[in-house]
Amino acid sequence: KIRLYFSDKIQSDLVSHLTKEQSHYVKDVMRLEKGDYLSVFNAQGEWSAIIENYEKEGARIKILKKVRDKDNEKNIWLAFSPIKQNPLNFIIQKGTELGVQKFIPILSERTIVKEINITRVKKIIVEASEQSNRISVPEINNLETLKNFLSQFPKNGYLLFCDINCEKNNLKNILSKKIEEP
């Protein structure tokens, strides 16, 4: 089943065009033809659609009906120091699949990689959302300092700090204790 993120407003009986990139994907990569079905989604839900035609502007689709409402997702943020591209891509993909709502790249004293390609990260987030059957697409913040992040962190939120050298209070133990609490 082909699922595509659709940033425009979606409603039944709407006729719209896919982007050129999405049109290339459905026509040339997935080889969908006129009359084939696909799904489009945004933060409001998921709709079934049919390809009406391939045009210069892109594939023209008709939205048929809503098949799924938006999900009630937990407000999970993932703050991380920028790292090299391949491990960063992995973090973004898996975080999206696991339900992260916001990615926050943090600059600290020991951060080696000082910038990330936000446009590329957004593309990875959309692709991971499409593949993992999510309705929402997580946000990616601009780089910020650790001090700024901590000053804006919600007072009623839980903050888990992961340290590769920590042996006693590892993430598994902390989360299992939290689940056991009423």
Question: Where in this protein do the model-derived segments appear?
Answer:
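Glycine-rich nucleotide phosphate-binding loop and flanking beta-alpha elements
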Residues: 46, 86, 166-170
